[in-house]
Amino acid sequence: GITQFDLANNYGPEPGSAEINFGRILKEDLGKYRDELIITTKAGYEMWDGPYGNWGSRKYLLASLDQSLKRMGLEYVDIFYHHRMDPETPLEETMGALASAVQSGKALYVGLSNYDGKTLSQAASILQEMHCPFVINQNRYSIFDRTVENNGLKKTAYRPLP
């Protein structure tokens, strides 16, 4: 059966609507299985207007996670991903926000999505120094795009069919 649910703060026809719908289904049908489920969410794309409604600042990531948890009716997610590299925010700030999510109990593990190999390696080192459980790398992967094979990390793919 299906045990992993991969969500993001901006998924759905309206940003956040996928999490709202998932939260309703979890409450009505799947709640008794919560301990058997892997629920993940991501933040990194635009959610609201203003300087902190996008990318990878500490303020944006932690506010987005709080909003995601509220929409889904959860106290924590199993994996919280940063959805894409941020060219403006220092990597240490972004990784620090992910580590804070784990330290606060709002995420059990962290993941990264859409990071290039060099930045991914740097981020993994920072997270390791912070003793933050970085467990997965989510990138595009297909027969035509195998660039993530060489990073030595566990991975999950999106768009496996071209």
Question: What do the predicted segments below correspond to?
Answer:
Residues 89-162:
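Beta/alpha (TIM)-barrel catalytic core signal, keyed to glycine-rich beta->alpha loops juxtaposed to Asp/Glu
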Residues 1, 55-72, 120-124:
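Short, acidic/polar
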Residues 47-62, 83-89:
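Active-site mouth loops of central-metabolism enzymes
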Residues 8-10, 42-46, 82-85, 112-118, ...:
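Active-site beta-loop-alpha junctions enriched in small/polar residues
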Residues 25-38, 69-73, 100-102, 124-133:
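Acidic (Asp/Glu)-rich catalytic clusters
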Residues 5, 22, 39, 68, ...:
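Conserved, mostly hydrophobic/aromatic
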